[in-house]
Amino acid sequence: MKRVKVIPAFLFAAIVAVCLASCGAVQNPVEYNNKLMTVVNDNEKSMNEMNTAMAGQDYTKAETVRKSWTEKLDKAIGEVDKMDALKEDEGLKTAVVNGLKAYKKIADNDYKTLIDLRNKEKSGDATVQLQIQASLTKINNGFDSIAGQINHASTAFEKKYNK
């Protein structure tokens, strides 16, 4: 009977185990969904900071939050872009990336406009009220649209993988 060398056999088994464990292309749908939703939900912290600053009429802080938020969104977009899409995911990752880009556009443009208008209002310019209302409506509608698109994609993803 032939003797099998234990070390080479053990080393081979270890290499196979590591290769199988590191195959990132085969992902768990629940983990994939959770990771994407965590990235999206992390924006809530910045939204809350923005709301607190705006409600307190601290527009200098609001501008600081806005800039920080856009940086966080850039990182989040990059993180999701680098993720391997789950095989046959036809929309969730795309919806999340598009949603993050839309949040960034709101933070970059719409909140900047709103902060500028609120500063003018605080300085006594009462003529900006209609513009403020229009900005608030645009921001809220944008948030609703983003949430709707991500929720729609998430529901479709759940139906597909919840078999």
Question: Predicted segment positions?
Answer:
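Short, charged, amphipathic alpha-helical segments
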Residues: 34, 60-68, 90-98, 126-138
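Short, solvent-exposed, charged loop/turn and helix-capping segments
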Residues: 76-100, 113, 117-118, 154, ...
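Bacterial N-terminal signal peptides that target proteins for export
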Residues: 1-12
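Short, charged/polar, low-complexity loop and linker segments
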Residues: 49-52, 75-88, 122-133
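Immediate post-signal-peptide N-terminus of mature secreted/exported proteins
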Residues: 23-71, 159-163
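C-terminal motif of bacterial Sec signal peptides marking the signal peptidase cleavage site
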Residues: 18-22
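Charged, amphipathic alpha-helical oligomerization/scaffolding segments
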Residues: 35-45, 49, 68-75, 79, ...
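A charged, solvent-exposed segment within the mature domains of Sec-exported extracytoplasmic proteins
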Residues: 118-163
